[in-house]
Swiss-Prot record:
Active site, UniProt feature: C75, C219
Location, primary (coarse class): cytoplasm
Keywords: Amino-acid biosynthesis, Cytoplasm, Isomerase, Lysine biosynthesis
Protein name stated in the entry: Diaminopimelate epimerase
Pathway linked to the protein: Amino-acid biosynthesis; L-lysine biosynthesis via DAP pathway; DL-2,6-diaminopimelate from LL-2,6-diaminopimelate: step 1/1
Protein family (similarity comment): Belongs to the diaminopimelate epimerase family.
MF-aspect GO terms: diaminopimelate epimerase activity
Length: 276
């Protein structure tokens, strides 16, 4: 059978988006891995699936597969594209929608200027909820990699993140250290690794090594986690403007117990069909 899909991106973080509300198919990890290959498939960072909800209090179910076939809890850049997609495809007439993910319920708001604001919910810091192996909760944790200690913040935005502060984003060891942090045994479900260079109280640069995808042009949940870590430790104040390789995201967070708001673009690239 042929499935219709849309290729989209949020700041260069690119997605294949499938509507499984009006189409019906059983998507398996092997399909994501096959389609995600940039040489022999469609090529993407993540596959986003739109489904009818299980929960009557939400509008849609939102599933995410990495290009390596692993299903993950959350994707912030994908959430913005998800909101744009369901509106463009007339699956809803609402500009503000609620969707369920493996990481919890999030709210998406398509603004008049085309930007999308995502209410990502409150960050989580309790190690067992990230999950991260630690004796007690702290703002910073020493993490040993190849005999060297690195200071990290550990945060969940519905998916796990480690945030490291660096002096210069251009020389940050994203490709050397990133995969080692991703697969560190203290993160039992693996982790996304963010490398943050603070410019001033409201501006910073960020690169993210994403779990199951490698370095991407942008990572929405990574931007949220980095902003939360920086505000928590007194390095920055809300609102935070983060420049990633693919462009800029704006993050607001009022402090513990409150939701993180992320605003950025969502762009449709092309429509296609793929054989299942």
């Amino acid at each position: 059978m042929l499935l219709r899909f849309t290729k989209m991106h949020g700041l260069g973080n690119d997605f294949m988006v499938l509507d499984l509300v009006s189409q019906h198919a059983h998507i398996q990890p092997k399909h994501a891995k096959q389609w995600g290959d940039r040489h022999t498939g469609i090529g993407f960072d993540q596959l986003l699936i739109v489904e009818a909800p299980n929960n009557p209090e939400v509008d849609f179910r939102y599933r995410i597969f990495n290009a390596d076939g692993s299903e993950v809890e959350q994707c912030g850049n994908g959430a913005r594209c998800f909101a744009r997609f369901v509106l463009d495809k007339r699956l809803t007439a609402k500009k503000r929608i609620r969707v369920e993910t493996k990481g919890g319920i999030i709210e998406l708001d398509v603004q008049n200027d085309g930007q999308v604001c995502v209410d990502m919910g409150p960050p989580r810091f309790i190690p067992a909820e990230i999950p991260f192996v630690a004796d007690e909760q702290a703002l910073n944790y020493p993490l040993e990699v190849d005999g060297e200690l690195h200071s990290i913040a550990a945060v969940s935005m519905g998916n796990p993140h480690a945030v490291l502060r660096v002096d210069d984003i251009r020389t940050a060891p994203v490709h050397g250290l990133g995969p080692k942090i991703e697969n560190h045994p203290r993160f039992p479900q693996r982790v996304n690794a963010g490398f943050l260079q603070v410019i001033d109280r409201h501006r910073a640069n960020l690169r993210v090594w994403e779990r199951g995808a490698g370095e991407t042009q942008a990572c929405g949940t990574g931007a949220c986690a980095a902003a939360v870590a920086a505000i928590s430790q007194g390095w920055m104040d809300s609102p935070v403007s983060l420049d990633l390789p693919g462009g800029r995201l704006n993050i607001e967070w009022a402090g513990p117990g409150t939701s993180v708001l992320m605003t950025g673009p969502a762009v449709r690239v092309y429509e296609g069909q793929v054989r299942l």
